[in-house]
From Swiss-Prot:
Binding positions (Mg(2+) 2): 538, 540
SMART domains: TOP2c, TOP4c
Residue ranges of domain Topo IIA-type catalytic in the record: 713-1125
Gene3D superfamilies: 3.30.1360.40, 3.30.1490.30, 3.30.230.10, 3.40.50.670, Histidine kinase-like ATPase, C-terminal domain, Topoisomerase II, domain 5, Topoisomerase, domain 3
GO biological process: DNA topological change; sister chromatid segregation
EC number: 5.6.2.2
Keyword ATP-binding recorded: yes
Co-factor note (free text): Binds two Mg(2+) per subunit. The magnesium ions form salt bridges with both the protein and the DNA. Can also accept other divalent metal cations, such as Mn(2+) or Ca(2+).
Positions of Mg(2+) 1 binding: 448, 538
Protein family according to the UniProt entry: Belongs to the type II topoisomerase family.
This protein's name: DNA topoisomerase 2
Provenance organism: Invertebrate iridescent virus 6
Length: 1132
């Protein structure tokens, strides 16, 4: 009889094994995952959010023991033995100790039901029951008041189960006993309780455990930071009860709730409220709009990550009362009303509550589900909040948005219009058969501007075929709509804004679209004026963006159009794009002529690398549709078509690319960009290419976003944005000795580098690069001549670009060494991918910008300190040591103070001096303003202070470069109440790194270390290049000298000789051939070169070349760098 090998289908687990096998059901997953958590630094000086990699269970087993200690504060309250201290200690091996005094667990077997073993009731000590057996608790009696976090009798036992060892020590002074018991092997084994006598007068409970790291993962610095946050929570909660909290023997300095909330570094106004019976306390803070700033809340000492009823108990009455005040009738805003969504993102709540018998969402207790709580918001609090400057600004901006969105019926009005194929749209040429029974066979061509329209008109007579047989031609079948202006990102726009965008409405009217219509049926498709759309964009990143915006419009509002339901449309897809080449190479061999078209830069570069480049090759760049001649249009019109197809991930990718709320996902998307990881090849020989929307987003549209960031974010190596780099390149190309008008230089740069974003942007860039007032540049890269703006208004008072001049300052070539130019990588537009400055300009001049998905704010630092640090780094590097850069921000000409204020933040202070009092009035002088506060702005602030009676008078004696305000007041004035301070952050230092990827640097040291490592490599590259260049020059010079001697000594006969004979002589005598394999450098020498003085010059040149080669041979890259630094220093 055969035996069965089938496993048992059903089984049971012990309580312990159930926790070990399925921990996520009770305590949380043991699998480490990336998530956002609050962490605290070693000094307990700041609480911040951070992405960490951690298993939830590892955190929870710590919190469960800690929560028991907090619960004991409440149990001990009002007793003869109140809790006075809680101590937490974490050893290097992960062993964790949590100790608390106060009321103790009695060392007795008389106060519990015991446990059942083999069907028999056995008495056990309270400690063994509480810490060693699941579902044991003192919290099951719901008839008594319970203001603790414990409820289910599971928490600390899970810590025991998920630990390799777990020990509990209890001292009971009343019974004069000490209890010790240790469990091992995940609570499966125990050495048994040991009870001894104790003379200690202070009772305590102490838990010592070592987590099962094999299951949970090891402690990291981030995890310890999370533990500190939970310990800090305990210190805050315990402070009101006079309980001291220690972490690793260090007492935490939290004395009240406000001390705790300050650690979140709130920069705006805040206010605190305490419920009359003391059961709850809240701090309400105004914050910059950020929907991810969740409330910070606690129930009975337990951190509730997701809030709950205690948070709602404050937020609901607060926002109800706030809106009732903000929405009072107004002549300006009439019947408009703000709603919750207009104000809630701007307030953050910090809540601490004590609740009887709390009910949570799960064992992890992230949210309070009941009881329902209602707290009281006094009217005076709402009055104060409404007077906050931030709230006033919010009120005004929110009502302005409502005013703009008042007319929400425009779409309905538009849809109610009858279908009119010959709609009046400026510059639109409708197809003759559009809107007829043959409209489904018509195609609307969408292009950019009138020059692109001309291209389309020239091309439609050629026609387009997607099958190779049925070619449609002419105006009967093709309509042409040139887009006039910027196409709206409709995914973030309300209906009013969308319909007011004429570019969108032109497309809607031309197509005959009806909002809300389902176009998945043949009948609904026939209602359109056109059956398909072809986009003809410019062949650049901006053209890709237009494609994306049009696709986004149809996907968001008319996604059913992507599904072909009309049989004829299978051969003519609904939406496609016509591509034109960006580069044409015209080969000019002796016989014949070949033209090769390239649709991507990558394909062109590959061709150049794989083919020998001939001087007769001609290159033509197509910068836009307007660069194509009329006679050339038929050759390329419709020859490369890309068909857009919907795919399963299209919605997710469209949201990622265009939706405001997906900002974090967009950042990660851009960070991971790899231009070499491509699956779509536009240079494929196929005429018709199929492209999924997801692939378009991730491989094509991302190029626009990256280019947008290049315009907005600086590069780590040269510290320049794209436009700044183009200006430096253009100025070097200009190479004029005289000053040049800003307007002239801008036009020259635009022409030289094919800058596509308007000369006005270049004018602004040039002006900013030359400005010298406080806060503009520590080292201006251009020399100003004229009025370039002052600190009066932050440079906005600059004169017109037509009237002011710039020049190349002497320092420019000391920072950007011309010797590096040959070894830099260059773009197709001509300028370097990045320059290689001798010093890190990114740290010296800083940078501010906003791009797609990213912004940056990099402070300025002292060039002298940076240079000293570079010298130290170079010297210590050669000794095998590492230098750490630690400097605080510095702004040239600033006379105030800059002080560190927590991690990643500094405060700049203006200067306020107290003069002698006069007639009961305080007299003050303001002689400096904080960074980025301009003189005119402070004058406006003083006018407001006078209206609010903070000050009495304000006399302005400031000049263009200095600040001087004389202020009198009946009150004592401070830096704080005059707002003479501003924050300088180092928490958003985003830039392109050495690999061309977007990277956020956390510290100045991180930037400097990477800059130094990359810069030293460039010096070595320069050294090798110079040696190669010098050796080649030496070889040529020595060959010239030998050639002169051989000719003069008649060893070589060249007079009346055939070329072949001369060449053979040179070959036989082993003369050096040039790069072309020729001897032209010898044979083209002028006969005057054979005169003695020229021979002497050549000999002197050879000696100089040998000296230079010797110098570069004996000098390492660090010494080269130091030499450049020493030459630069006198110009700083």
């Amino acid at each position: 009889m055969a035996t069965s090998n089938h496993k048992k289908q059903y089984t049971t687990l012990s309580d312990i094994d159930h926790v070990l096998l399925r921990p996520e059901v009770i305590i949380g997953s043991t699998v480490p995952m990336e998530q956002t958590e609050y962490v605290v630094d070693e000094n307990f000086s700041e609480i911040l959010e951070k992405q960490v990699f951690v298993s939830e269970a590892l955190i929870r087993i710590f919190v469960e023991v800690l929560a028991n200690a907090v619960d004991n504060i409440h149990r001990s309250k009002g007793s003869s033995t109140p809790c006075k201290s809680i101590k937490i200690k974490i050893e290097d091996d992960g062993t964790t100790m949590i100790h608390n005094d106060g009321q103790v667990i009695k060392i007795s077997k008389e106060e519990n039901d015991g446990i059942e073993i083999n069907g028999k009731k056995c008495s056990v000590y309270n400690h063994e029951l509480v810490f060693g057996h699941l579902r044991s608790s003192s919290n099951y009696d719901d008839t008594v008041v319970r203001q603790t976090s414990g409820k289910n009798g599971l928490g600390v036992k899970c810590t025991n189960i998920l630990s390799k060892s777990f020990k509990v020590i209890g001292v009971d002074p009343e019974n004069k006993k000490k209890f010790v018991q240790e469990w091992t092997n995940n609570m499966k084994e125990t050495s048994g309780p040991k009870v001894t006598t104790s003379s200690s007068k202070t009772g305590y409970t102490e838990v010592i455990y070592c987590p099962d790291f094999e299951r949970l993962g090891n402690f990291s610095s981030d995890i310890i930071g999370i533990f500190r946050k939970h310990v800090l929570d305990v210190a805050m909660l315990a402070s009101s009860e006079g309980v001291s909290v220690y972490f690793n023997d260090k007492k935490l300095p939290i004395k009240k709730f406000s001390d705790y909330t300050k650690l979140f570094k709130l920069e705006k106004e805040s206010i605190s409220i305490t419920e009359e019976d003391g059961s709850s306390e809240v701090t309400i803070a105004f914050v910059e709009r950020d929907g991810k700033k969740k409330p910070i809340s606690f129930v009975n000492g337990l951190f509730t990550k997701h809030g709950g009823q205690h948070v709602d108990g404050w937020t609901k009455p607060f926002f109800a009362n706030l809106l009732s005040v903000l929405n009072k009738p107004s002549k300006t805003y009439k019947d408009l009303k703000l709603s919750l969504k207009d104000v809630t993102p701007y307030f953050r709540f910090f809540v601490k509550s004590t609740v009887d018998k709390p009910q949570f969402d799960c064992q992890n207790k992230n949210m309070l589900k009941s009881p329902c709580l209602k707290y009281t918001i006094p009217d005076k609090i709402i009055t104060k909040v409404c007077k906050w400057t931030s709230v006033q600004e919010l009120k005004q901006s929110s009502f302005e948005k409502l005013l703009k969105g008042k007319d929400n019926n425009i779409i309905k009005t538009l849809n109610d219009k009858k279908r009119r194929p010959k709609v009046s749209v400026k510059e639109y040429d409708p197809a003759n058969k559009a809107g007829t029974t043959l409209s489904e066979k018509c195609t609307l061509i969408v292009c950019e501007g009138l020059s692109a329209k001309t291209y389309a008109v020239a091309g439609i007579s050629t026609g387009i075929s997607f099958t190779g047989t049925d070619t449609k031609k002419g105006r009967d079948w093709f309509g042409i709509l040139p887009l006039r202006g910027k196409f709206l990102n409709v995914r973030n726009a309300n209906n009013d804004k969308m319909i007011k965008n004429t570019v969108v409405t032109d497309l809607v009217n031309a197509m005959g679209l009806t909002f809300g219509m389902d176009y998945s049926t043949q009948k609904s498709r026939k209602s359109l004026n056109y059956g398909s759309i072809i986009i003809i964009p410019d062949p650049d990143e901006d053209g890709i963006h237009i494609e994306g915006l049009v696709l986004n419009f149809f996907h968001h509002h008319f996604s059913s159009l992507f599904n072909p339901v009309v049989p004829n449309l299978k051969d003519f897809p609904f939406i496609s794009s016509m591509k034109i080449p960006i580069i044409k190479v015209i080969e000019k061999p002796l016989k014949g002529r070949r033209e090769i078209e390239f649709f991507t830069h990558e394909a062109f570069h590959k061709f150049k690398n794989e083919n020998k480049w001939h001087k007769n090759h001609e290159i033509k760049y197509f910068k836009g549709l307007g660069t194509t001649k009329h006679e050339d249009v038929p050759k390329i019109f419709g020859k490369k078509m890309v068909v857009f197809n919907i795919d399963d991930n299209a919605h997710e990718n469209m949201e990622k690319a265009f939706k405001d709320e997906e900002a974090d996902e967009r950042k990660e998307w851009l960070k991971q960009y790899n231009p070499n990881a491509r699956t779509f090849d536009l240079d494929s020989p196929n005429k018709i290419l199929q492209l999924n929307i997801s692939t378009f987003i991730n491989e094509e549209l991302i190029k626009f976003s990256i280019e947008d960031c290049k315009r907005s974010l600086p590069h780590l190596i040269d510290g320049l944005k794209e436009s700044q780099r183009k200006v430096i390149f253009g100025l070097k190309q200009w190479n004029g000795k005289n000053n040049i008008k800003v307007a002239q230089l801008g036009a020259f740069v635009a022409q030289k580098t094919d800058y596509k974003h308007g000369e006005q942007n270049l004018f602004d860039t040039i002006i900013k690069m030359a400005q010298t007032f406080v806060g503009a540049n520590n080292i201006p890269l251009l020399e100003e001549d004229g009025q370039f703006g002052t600190r009066l208004s932050g440079g906005k008072d600059a004169a017109s670009p037509r009237y002011i001049f710039v020049n190349q300052p002497p320092i420019l070539n000391k920072i950007f060494r011309p010797e590096d130019d040959p070894i830099l990588n260059y773009t197709l537009d001509g300028e370097p991918v990045f320059y290689a400055p001798v010093i890190p300009l990114i740290c010296i001049n800083g940078s501010v910008g906003v791009g797609t998905g990213f912004s940056c704010n990099i402070p300025m630092f002292n060039p002298s300190e940076i240079i000293d640090g570079l010298k130290q780094w170079i010297n210590m590097r050669e000794q095998g040591e590492k230098y750490v850069f630690k400097y605080k921000p510095w702004y040239k000409g600033f006379t105030g103070k800059i002080e560190k204020n927590g991690s990643g933040r500094y405060i700049s202070y203006g200067t306020l001096s107290n003069e002698a009092s006069n007639n009961g009035m305080y007299q003050y002088t303001v002689s400096e303003l904080p960074i980025n506060m301009w003189t005119d702005k402070f004058k406006e602030m003083c006018d407001q202070y006078r209206e609010s009676n903070l000050i009495k008078t304000c006399d302005n004696y400031s000049e263009v470069t200095t600040v001087n305000f004389k202020i009198s007041s009946e009150h004592e004035l401070t830096i704080e109440n005059l707002k003479l301070r501003s924050y300088i952050h180092t928490s958003n230092m985003v830039m392109f790194d050495h690999e061309g990827k977007i990277h956020k640097y956390e510290t100045l040291n991180g930037i400097m270390q990477r800059f130094c490592k990359e810069r030293i490599k460039i010096y070595e590259k320069r050294r090798q290049y110079m040696l190669q260049k010098l050796n080649k020059s030496l070889t040529i010079s020595e060959n010239k000298k030998r050639f002169m001697e051989d000719v003069m000594n008649q060893k070589i006969k060249i007079l009346l000789q055939e070329d072949e004979v001369v060449h053979q002589q040179l070959l036989d005598m082993n003369y050096y051939k040039d790069d072309e394999g020729e001897f032209d450098y010898l044979l083209n020498m002028n006969i005057g070169g054979f005169r003695k003085k020229n021979v002497d010059k050549l000999i002197s040149k050879i000696d100089d070349l040998k000296k230079d080669i010797m110098w570069y041979t004996n000098t390492n890259e660090g010494q080269m760098w130091l030499k450049d630094i020493l030459e630069l220093e006198p110009f700083i």
